[in-house]
Amino acid sequence: MTKDEAWDLGNHWVAAWNAHDLGAILAHYEDAVELTSPVVAQLLGISDGKVVGKENLRAYFRRGLEAYPELQFRLYEVFWGSRSVVLCYSNQRGTRTAEFMELSASGKVAKVVANYSG
């Protein structure tokens, strides 16, 4: 992955979220994706904070968009590796987030670990 590819991924991902376009958001993810986030526990009541599979991810993201109708992200930094990125962004409330995303051979997100400030 190059710097430009990583930024392109980040910009497209943020644009999909800011449009609240669930289909465009999910297009970034593998069917067998795993996402871990403390917000999963908060919104879905899953104690380990883990969502497995694209359909479960769809339900989680839908719940998030319903809970936060004013949701907007601003991407401010992208780190990249050979098959991973870290997207650093803030939301409409100023909460800063860093999401580590491991990419599959096809370039889709296979694993996510979300980390939040404050």
For the regions a protein language model found, what residue spans apply to each?
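A generic alpha-helix structural signal
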Residues: 10, 58-61, 113
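Hydrophobic pocket/interface hotspot
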Residues: 13, 25, 33, 53, ...
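A beta-strand edge to alpha-helix "cap/lid" segment located at domain peripheries
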Residues: 65-118
